[in-house]
Regions:
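Conserved nucleotide-binding/hydrolysis micro-motifs of P-loop NTPases
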Residues: 126-127, 168-172, 188-193
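Phosphate-sensing "switch" segment of ASCE/P-loop ATPases
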Residues: 158-160, 175-243
């Protein structure tokens, strides 16, 4: 027994029987179709909208290839249409869709209800904890999974599942810089009218309409994005979450540059300063000397001295020059942390010392 969307005939019973929808010519016109109108509304960005369509088409065309990308739909309020989209996709992937109510569902034993699926969605999922976040990343891209049933030894099976999660919690997922697995979508904070919902569900409850959608995606040109291979698009929402999860030992330099400019600080003392900063600002202080050292050396390569232990020598940097260095290393983060507009270009000009500002003892 197997679940093989490639449908290779090797005399083994295949639990995958293909789509329930017959192949036919689709007459869907995207511009005035009720499903695509809502998908566009929820995507809230033309680039996200195009990626979303390619993502769906990828599963329809090549169900034997995972997308390796989970889509997270966030809105501050409910009723914007997030779950309506997942309901439609459950119908599109009829017989091969599943639902999780808690993030722990993907890690617990006796998980047969989540096997042999192409599409799985979760409501109000919270994966902000690092342990949960790391496990979720594995699930999104894993090619195999263990099937466990009570009283029966677990067996390894192929995993073709793809995920969408919906949430009203802005910080539901822990995002790290360089993440390749999550498409973070900030939906509009505008609830749909009751009549819009009624019309949408009337549409998707008609199997003929879903069949039309299936065939539309079956022939859709999804070559703009090589789903599962290309790096997932970076949205402003995802960038914001990544910045908010910037380690304390990096944030402290951008927040308080004046404390370090003009100083020569040993790596051990700088680590202690990072731990203190993290605790004072309710950030994670669970980082090792190795992690801290690797990242900080990368940030200040030209200022690392290794005489009698590692030191960071900023004595030739004024606060202005220190800020300028930080800006050059990560312009977007510098603007974010200083609440500056994305198109703002700072000028780093040393403030002239006025005669009256000179300390008479230094004159």
């Amino acid at each position: 027994m197997k679940f093989d969307p490639m449908m290779i005939d090797d005399n083994t019973y295949n639990m995958y029987k293909g789509s329930v929808y017959s192949k036919m010519e689709s007459h869907v016109e995207e511009t005035n179709n009720i499903f695509f109108k809502l998908l566009k509304h929820v995507s809230n960005d033309p680039v996200v909208y195009e990626y979303f369509k390619c993502w769906i088409s990828h599963i329809v065309k090549t169900p034997y290839k995972k997308t390796n990308v989970a889509i997270i739909l966030y809105s501050m309020i409910g009723g914007v249409g997030k779950n309506a989209i997942t309901d439609a996709l459950c119908k599109l992937f009829k017989n091969y869709s599943g639902h999780i109510e808690n993030i722990d569902d993907i890690t617990k034993n006796f998980n047969s209800h989540l096997t042999n699926k192409l599409f799985i969605y979760g409501d109000e999922i919270n994966a902000n904890a690092k342990k949960v976040s790391d496990k979720l990343k594995q699930v999104i891209t894993r090619p195999k999974q263990n099937l466990e049933k009570k009283g029966i030894d677990s067996i390894e099976i192929d995993d073709y599942s793809n995920y969408i999660f919906t949430t009203n919690n802005e910080n539901c997922f822990k995002i790290e810089e360089g993440d390749r697995r999550l498409l973070m979508v900030k939906c509009p904070d505008k609830a749909l009218e009751k009549e819009d919902y009624k019309a949408f569900y009337n549409y998707i409850n008609d199997p003929n309409n879903i069949c039309e959608l299936y065939n539309y995606f079956l022939t859709y040109d999804n070559s703009k994005y090589e789903i599962g291979v290309d790096r997932v698009i970076m949205t402003a929402y995802k960038k914001q979450l990544a910045y908010e999860n910037t380690p304390a030992y990096t944030e402290m330099f951008y927040k308080e540059p004046g404390l370090y400019a003009g100083q020569c600080i040993s790596s051990t003392h700088l680590l202690d300063m990072a731990k203190d900063y993290a605790k004072k600002n309710y950030l994670s202080s669970n980082f090792t000397m190795t992690t801290f050292g690797t990242q900080t050396k990368a940030l200040f390569t030209d200022y690392v001295k290794r005489n009698n232990g590692t030191k960071y020598d900023f004595r030739n940097l004024s606060t202005t020059k220190f800020k300028e260095h930080l800006y050059k290393m990560n312009k977007d983060y510098y603007l974010y942390i200083n609440n500056l507009e994305s198109d703002y270009i700072p000028t780093f000009v040393e403030k002239a010392i006025e005669k009256d500002d000179v300390n008479p003892l230094d004159a």
